[in-house]
Amino acid sequence: MQGFPRITVDICEKYRYNLSMLYNYHTHTKRCKHAEGKDKKYVEQAIKAGLKTLGFSDHAPYLFPNTDYYSTYRMEVDELHEYARSIRALKKEYAKDIEILCGFELEYYPKFHAREMEFLNQVNPDYLIMGQHFIGNELSLLYAPRQSEDNMLEAYVSQVLEGLATGHFLYLAHPDLPGFRFSKEAVEREYTRLCEGAKKLNIPLEINLLGIRENRPYPSRKFFEIAARVGNSVVLGIDAHDPSHLRDSYPERLAENMINDLGLHLIEEKLL
């Protein structure tokens, strides 16, 4: 990982203290098929960590018209209402201890977006965050981190900015997900365009703590050097896929070190 020391289990155990951050809007549930733990356990760990707001934002069920495509990393369409009921029941149960919000992490697929918003609005979500994993849409199988052609990075940035311009998204999760397998010129040009576009729209960029925890290529210091130069605001997103992630403060400390080194503006107050 660029800019971060490798994290081991021993290090994570050593730094399992309360978090400095008070608001987290990036939390998954087992419905997405790659997270663990009951919804209630996430809430209990968030309270122990000292969070004031826990936003659930599981991978939204997506309506793909006229296709047999099956997603292996998001909740099922028929789980939409059960998810919302579960999160809002916890919101009521723990109202004296923590604010709980019901949201979704969602890709922007231009051809399907209007229909998808109509579908999700059945449960009146509190917010959406954009987590753009595919270029075009999932049916194209163009998974962003596996691309290396410059035109693919250009397409990713254009699609993200078009989605952010809808005004439907609270912030952009893991903005540097495509990585750096492109030419240096394309990386500088397109990530600058992404940062400038997000700043113009006043949309924060997420420093993804799961990426630090799992030693992924993101968040990248190289990307956030560009964000610092452009003047973007950033937020921390735990991207919790297990209740224990909400008590793991070591990735947060590493992220804060980078923020201070680069002079980034960290939004520490509530976004909603």
Residues of each region from the PLM?
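Hydrophobic alpha-helical segments and helix pairs
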Residues: 98-143
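Mid-to-C-terminal alpha-helical segments outside catalytic/metal-binding sites
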Residues: 249-272
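Domain-core and long-helix interface of multi-subunit machines
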Residues: 129-230
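An N-terminally biased module of ancient metal coordination in phosphate/nucleic-acid-related enzymes
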Residues: 13-110, 120, 181-195, 202, ...
